[in-house]
Amino acid sequence: MCIALPYKYRIAPLYIYVEDKDVLSHIMPSKDDNANRIETKLNTLGLKLPEPLKVPTNVKTPFTWVRISGNKAYISGHGPQNPDGSVAGPFGKVGGGAVGESEVSVAQAYQAAKLAGLSILGSLKRELGNLDLVTGWLQVRGMVNAAAGFTQTTDVINGFSDLILTLYGPELGMHARSAIGVQALPLGLPVIIEALVEVSV
């Protein structure tokens, strides 16, 4: 078999003749090699991507969860979901003084941020078909439904960042990030996260 090297690797026309299929497989890996690498990692970690969000009937969503433009994917704000697509609790403000039924601990909010990450990955999978097509996590904006005076928003959104870095590694997964406290979030969610990623489409 004759292989023409891509232009950027040539100084002058160069052709290599390869007859051994094993050698050929190392020179030109199959498109299926390492296919679904990210989903394999998810399975190894015992994590499951949720079904599409089951939006409450009284909530209108005149927008798309993921918008592709060129090699960028703009991702709308996602909250935590259960595997069946329903909105995941607990609900209410994160932190605060008195312990109340509607309050959310930092540990619970960290887990909610992780679930929001899985929600985003689920939307990306439905849009791209393969999570391996994400070639870089560029920017993340995390919003925390913070009680008055709560300052541990960074600890909360680390739940998302830790997940992405575990799955994609620092080369692709390291991102610019904001973690801000807000007065309220839709449906009383403890966290909502939006992102900008680079994709290969």
Question: Predicted regions span which residues?
Answer:
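N-terminal presequence-like segments and the immediate start of the first folded domain
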Residues: 14-118, 122-141, 146-201
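N-terminal polybasic/positive-inside topogenic patches
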Residues: 5-11, 15-17
